[in-house]
Amino acid sequence: MTNHHFVLFEDELWRHFATLVQARPLFALRCGAFTAQERLTALTGETVSGLCRSHLLGCFGPEAGPFSLLHDGRPLLLVNARARDLNWLHDLAAAPINTVYLDNGDLLGASISPGLASAVLYFLREQQIAEARDELCRFAHVVELPPADRPRLIRFPWDLITFAGEQIVRDLPLL
């Protein structure tokens, strides 16, 4: 797809799923045919890293730690772990580096340089997404998706069930 490092991140709303995600990150919950990580891997053909709570990072994060993603100078493409519909991802990957996608104020995704990533990785690792979003908005081009283009974001555990049928249909081409 591109020359990016693909990174899924948990945001503050992981707490809504606390009973389901004590031993796994939010991006490991299945909705439709895939988990968010499996879906992104199937869509891009790339290895997908994850940023999650510190007690899970050793198992689900980058092997050498989050800051190892900066070592080779490739840009990062960040994807919110609550996003189920990834139709917007190709546009973000094709956008200029340092572009941020917002969905009604929520950080949906970003294509960022390693320099800008070094300023926000701490916030992402700590699920302080509001701070990361504010920092990204200071230095990057911001795109607020119009209502018609907004993807489905899971917000509560029952969304995994509610969105499952629709998501299976979206996942069929990736199977």
What are these regions (language model features)?
Residues 1-175:
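Terminal amphipathic alpha-helical/low-complexity segments used for targeting or macromolecular assembly
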